[in-house]
């Protein structure tokens, strides 16, 4: 019995030492909770909330939530959001998937140890290649927006328009994207062109 306990302890230590253990547990739990315990969200543009609290494992050396943790929490909240509104299910039905192609973050105020917060996620819109998602970190102490994250979910294997049409059973015009988001999209495109030029891909693509 003791040997079994030691083996299980060693296995648990190896799991958390070699893998991102809590993340690999939380994501499936978030998906199952969104599917089984929460109601389906029919409005693609509706805001959804995901509750959290700053834990000791989230802290940096200044005892604030580590900047990288915001990206992780936004990732979990985004997966739950896309599950509840049916986007992930539609992607699977179409044999497609969405990958994170770009993100940006604004940090406005630190979240401190044990501070409760909400990640409010919403779909801002889409174009011919990607969905654009926003996540706001709201302190539940005073309602302040502590951080704002935007992400570009690039769709592979189909188009965002087909995903939305699959969900809504009709063609839906995408909403107009906010001006600041349009500037960010333009920045990403300019950055992509610059990187292609640096690697020689720009000339290759033009020849093709």
UniProtKB/Swiss-Prot annotation:
Signal peptide: 1-21
Alphabetically ordered keywords of this record: Phosphoprotein, Secreted, Signal
Keyword Cytoplasm: no
Subcellular location: Secreted
Short name of one Pfam family: 4HBT_2
InterPro entries: HotDog_dom_sf, THEM6_lcsJ_thioesterase
Gene name of the encoded protein: THEM6
Protein name: Protein THEM6
Domain of life of the source: Eukaryota
GO CC, alphabetical: extracellular region
Family listed: Belongs to the THEM6 family.
Keyword Signal among UniProt keywords: yes
Modified residues (Phosphoserine): 199
């Amino acid at each position: 019995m003791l040997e079994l306990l030691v083996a299980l302890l060693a296995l648990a230590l190896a799991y958390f030492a070699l893998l991102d253990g809590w993340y690999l547990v939380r994501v499936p739990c978030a998906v199952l909770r969104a599917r089984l315990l929460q109601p389906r969200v029919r409005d693609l543009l509706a805001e959804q909330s995901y509750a959290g609290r700053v834990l000791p494992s989230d802290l940096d050396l200044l005892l604030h939530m580590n900047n990288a943790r915001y990206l992780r929490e936004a990732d979990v909240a985004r997966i739950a959001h896309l599950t509840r509104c049916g986007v992930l299910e539609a992607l699977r039905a179409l044999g497609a998937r969405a990958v994170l192609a770009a993100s940006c973050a604004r940090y406005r105020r630190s979240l401190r140890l044990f501070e409760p917060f909400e990640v409010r996620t919403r779909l801002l819109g889409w174009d011919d290649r990607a969905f654009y998602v926003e996540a706001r970190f709201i302190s539940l102490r005073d309602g302040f927006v502590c951080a704002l994250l935007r992400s570009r979910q690039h769709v592979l294997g189909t188009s965002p328009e087909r995903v939305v049409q699959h969900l809504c059973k009709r063609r839906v015009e995408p909403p107009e994207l906010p001006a600041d988001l349009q500037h960010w999209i333009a920045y990403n495109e300019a950055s992509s062109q610059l990187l292609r030029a640096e690697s020689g891909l720009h000339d290759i693509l033009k020849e093709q």
